[in-house]
């Protein structure tokens, strides 16, 4: 949805979802024209408009036929999915590393009965990862979330079936997305003990930042002088200096110092 809003030049996007909440809940997520969820003052403005409605009969409506005819309503198809997948794949910073390791890494994935199954597995397949297994009990969409009480990939309970399958397959990585696929949980295997450990959001973010910056540094795409020039142009008050142990590793964070 975030991608489609920007790609199609929409002023907003709406997702009817309870996200990672229990099945008795429902919800309403609104995205602004930048593809991000509403923030002040837009959220307040929308709420004020809703509260101003005294009678639903006064709300202006139009028929689906008229909306289609006027171009205000469009049913998006596979072309948006394809563009989104290509955009995600374009974010890869080291395809060579993937090519070297894709046959040696085993990944367990669960969409937790939600919408992530097709796009997540498609991206991994098209990038070349061959050993990807989905948790069968949680593969298909089901708003009742029968295998978990709380489909939040931050909760240990949500990983129970994924970790069980990971041990059976001797997997290296366990991934879970929440039902509307905008939240990611990660477990990694300790190569020494064979135990699986969760990564917090802060850990995952730090590792991603470390890896992307390490790849850019290794390829000479971001010289310090260039970074300082960009910082000056954008009004940034701090410059960040990065040091990596091994640019081919997605871990090994050493230091990020403000200067």
List PLM regions with ranges.
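Ferredoxin-reductase
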Residues: 1-33
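Conserved phosphate-binding catalytic cores of ATP/NTP-utilizing and phosphoryl-transfer enzymes
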Residues: 1-11, 155-172
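Short, ordered loop/turn segments at secondary-structure junctions
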Residues: 17-19, 43, 137-140, 179, ...
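Flexible loop/turn segments at secondary-structure boundaries
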Residues: 21-24, 115-117, 141-144, 181-185, ...
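Short Gly/Thr/Asp-enriched flexible loops that form oxyanion-binding sites at enzyme active sites
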Residues: 24-32, 182-201
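Gly/Ser/Thr-enriched, mixed-charge loops and adjacent short helices
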Residues: 26-160, 165-166, 225, 231
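Proline/glycine-rich low-complexity loops and linkers
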Residues: 54-79, 190-259
């Amino acid at each position: 949805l975030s991608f489609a809003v920007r790609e199609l030049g929409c002023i907003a996007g709406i997702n009817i979802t309870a996200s990672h909440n229990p099945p008795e809940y429902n919800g309403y997520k609104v995205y602004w024209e930048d593809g991000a969820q509403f923030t002040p003052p837009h959220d307040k403005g929308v709420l004020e408009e809703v509260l101003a409605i005294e009678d639903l009969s006064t709300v202006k409506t139009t028929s689906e036929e008229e909306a289609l005819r006027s171009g205000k309503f469009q049913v998006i198809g596979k072309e948006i999915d394809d563009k989104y997948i290509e955009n995600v794949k374009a974010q890869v910073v080291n395809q060579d590393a993937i090519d070297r390791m894709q046959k040696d890494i085993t990944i367990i994935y669960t969409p937790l009965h939600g919408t992530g199954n097709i796009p997540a597995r498609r991206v991994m397949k098209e990038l070349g990862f061959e050993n990807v297994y989905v948790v069968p009990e949680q593969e298909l969409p089901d708003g009742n979330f029968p295998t978990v009480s709380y489909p939040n990939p931050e909760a240990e309970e949500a990983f129970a079936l994924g970790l069980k399958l990971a041990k059976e397959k001797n997997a290296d990585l366990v991934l879970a997305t929440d039902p509307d696929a905008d939240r990611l949980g990660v477990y990694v295997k300790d190569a020494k003990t064979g135990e699986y450990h969760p990564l917090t959001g802060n850990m995952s973010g730090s590792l991603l930042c470390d890896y992307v910056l390490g790849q850019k540094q290794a390829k000479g795409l971001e010289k310090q002088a260039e970074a300082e020039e960009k910082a000056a142009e954008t009004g940034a008050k701090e410059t960040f200096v990065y040091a990596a142990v091994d640019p081919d590793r997605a871990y090994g964070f050493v230091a990020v110092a403000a200067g």
